[in-house]
């Protein structure tokens, strides 16, 4: 035991040393060995096509960071264009979109390249709102603690994979492997991202709900809360303009500076659909109660959301009778880990529906599993948790009606459970249907000229036309929704300048391979497969319909607002239906488990470092 502890401690120390060496010798190579000085840069201003253009006077030279010192009376968008050589010596033009944020007076952009020319463009009409005081390069040595710690965590992650392999990489311990890998990957995301919103879907709304959940009475928002919620959605400091570790620090200094002038009265009204905010709200308010700076509180709220996701999915992987490894891979998709590390209630839906499906599958397959009180609580609580957040997943609850009668102690118990299932299904459906019919459900103004009552009237007046629209739209957009769903990092990709399909085919092949080969000898009957497929199809149609009602202009011939993440909870129930009865996996379990877990780990690391760490923490 002592030898193992000593060995692990030694490797951790080695990882620390290696991460420091990489940070110092690789990322600061030019500062140490080429001694390239930092300097002020002269520039000239011209106009072109209605834009003011700042041309920097420089020779072909290495620039690590470009610093623009300015004064702005409003947020002003600008483009930074620079020419550099690629690996083949060919000159290429690079374009970086950024903002002169009026909350700050310095913009720091990572170049990290030899450049021959740089031009900065912004609308000429904004000239009276902007004064460029000076431009300079920063080629000095910089020890970036966030980057170094991220590298350290990656080294620890690979060491864990080595330890798992040496210990046999046992299938029955896959929940532990998932928990370790998921926690490390999510932690890197949380640490590297700025402590603000507008990086994942609607996170400013989710963060505000998390802040308000445990707030009662007259509440004054802190500066960070004010800039990170819907309260100041139009002019949030740092929104879309944090592109370096220096700008992160400037934003943190502002957000940690105390209270804002914005206050509101928060009434304690615990509605059922707020249940998904409890983990992140609890973490945030505990940190706030401890008087920690906003930038730290913000990350702790995210970490609680991640931890809740990891613990419950790990529990599900441990207890489910089939598809352990398949569930782990789905839960480790870049989209899954990213959303679990954000202010988002999408993980709540995934957790609730996955636990429900796992418990139901155990009832279908395991002869020793009875429908006892514990099983009933897990089933009813998990599906309610998912549907309280988003009621459109309620069709899955009807699968409880297919539990074999021999699972119940008495016929009376079976009748009570089925009656309770129908009653709760109606109740959960009512949380969505009644507000829609009564007109109390609000449409989403972001969709344009939307109206719930108006859209319903249009649909009921032209039911055949809507059915055609629904079918045509779902079929036409199916491939896009699938291809965008595996490694979609929301608004992060706008900053990283890349699409969300870089690893789609690798992940698709991996998921199909694991769904077919993760076979323990048990598989669902045709009846159960068909029922799950029908529930998935009905839920998918409800997703499209819900967005047509709430997010699409009345009478429009398309359906707006449907995003791939809404279908992520359906992935596991759909793929377990593909598990064959007659195919036996003869691959060595240790080798098989190593391969299928290492692939998503590598993809996540590449995705996180190229799209998050390199964009926000360099």
Q: PLM features: what roles do these ranges have?
A:
Residues 13-34, 172-203, 211-251, 422-439, ...:
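Transmembrane signal-anchor helices characteristic of membrane glycosylation enzymes that use polyprenol
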Residues 216-300:
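Interfacial juxtamembrane loops and adjacent helix segments
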Residues 359-368, 394-426:
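Perimembrane helix-loop-helix junctions
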């Amino acid at each position: 035991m002592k030898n193992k502890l000593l060995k692990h401690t030694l490797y951790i120390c080695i990882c620390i040393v290696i991460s420091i060496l990489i940070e110092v010798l690789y990322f600061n190579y030019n500062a140490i060995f080429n001694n390239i000085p930092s300097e002020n840069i002269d520039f000239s201003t011209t106009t072109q096509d209605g834009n003011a253009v700042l041309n920097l006077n420089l020779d072909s030279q290495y620039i690590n960071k470009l610093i623009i010192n300015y004064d702005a009376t409003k947020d002003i968008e600008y483009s930074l264009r620079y020419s550099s050589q690629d690996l083949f010596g060919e000159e290429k033009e690079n374009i970086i979109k950024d903002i002169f944020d009026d909350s700050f007076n310095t913009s720091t952009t990572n170049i990290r390249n030899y450049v021959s020319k740089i031009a900065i463009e912004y609308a000429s009409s904004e000239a009276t709102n902007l004064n460029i005081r000076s431009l300079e390069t920063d080629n000095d040595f910089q020890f970036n603690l966030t980057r170094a710690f991220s590298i350290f965590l990656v080294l620890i992650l690979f060491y864990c994979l080595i330890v798992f392999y040496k210990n046999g990489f046992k299938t029955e311990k896959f929940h532990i492997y998932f928990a370790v890998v998921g926690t490390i990957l999510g932690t890197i995301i949380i640490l590297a991202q700025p402590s603000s919103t507008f990086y994942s879907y609607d996170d400013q709304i989710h963060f505000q709900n998390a802040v308000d959940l445990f707030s009662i009475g007259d509440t004054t928002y802190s500066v960070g809360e004010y800039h990170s919620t819907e309260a100041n959605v139009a002019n949030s400091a740092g929104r879309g303009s944090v592109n370096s570790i220096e700008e992160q620090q400037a934003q943190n200094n502002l957000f940690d500076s105390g209270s804002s002038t914005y206050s509101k009265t928060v009434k304690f009204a615990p509605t059922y659909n707020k249940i998904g905010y409890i983990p992140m709200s609890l973490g945030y308010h505990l940190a706030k109660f401890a008087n920690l700076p906003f930038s730290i509180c913000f990350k702790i709220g995210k970490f609680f959301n991640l931890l809740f996701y990891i613990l419950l999915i790990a529990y599900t992987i441990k207890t489910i009778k089939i598809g352990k490894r398949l569930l782990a891979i789905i839960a480790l998709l870049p989209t899954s880990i990213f959303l679990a590390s954000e202010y988002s209630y999408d993980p709540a839906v995934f957790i609730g529906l996955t636990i429900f499906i796992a418990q139901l599958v155990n009832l279908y397959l395991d002869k020793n599993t009875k429908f006892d009180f514990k099983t009933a609580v897990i089933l009813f609580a998990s599906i309610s948790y998912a549907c309280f957040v988003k009621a459109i997943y309620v069709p899955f609850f009807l699968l409880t009606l297919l539990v074999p009668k021999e699972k119940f102690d008495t016929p009376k118990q079976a009748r009570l459970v089925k009656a309770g299932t129908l009653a709760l299904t109606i109740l959960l459906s009512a949380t969505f249907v009644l507000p829609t019919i009564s007109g109390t459900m609000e449409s989403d103004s972001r969709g344009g000229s939307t109206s719930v009552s108006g859209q319903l009237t249009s649909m009921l007046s032209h039911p055949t036309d809507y059915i055609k629209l629904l079918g045509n739209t779902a079929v036409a957009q199916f491939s896009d929704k699938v291809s965008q769903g595996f490694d979609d990092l929301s608004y992060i990709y706008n900053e990283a300048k890349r699409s969300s399909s870089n690893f789609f085919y690798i992940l698709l092949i991996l998921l199909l391979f694991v769904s077919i080969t993760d076979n323990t000898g048990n598989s669902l009957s045709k009846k159960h497969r068909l029922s799950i497929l029908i529930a998935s199809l009905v839920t998918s149609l409800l997703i499209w319909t819900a967005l047509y009602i709430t997010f699409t202009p009345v009478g429009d011939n398309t359906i707006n607002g449907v995003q791939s993440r809404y279908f992520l909870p359906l992935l596991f129930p759909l793929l377990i239906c593909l598990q064959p009865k007659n195919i036996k996996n003869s691959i060595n379990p240790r080798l098989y488990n190593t391969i299928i877990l290492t692939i998503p780990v590598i993809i996540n690391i590449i995705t996180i470092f190229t799209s998050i760490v390199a964009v926000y923490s360099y």
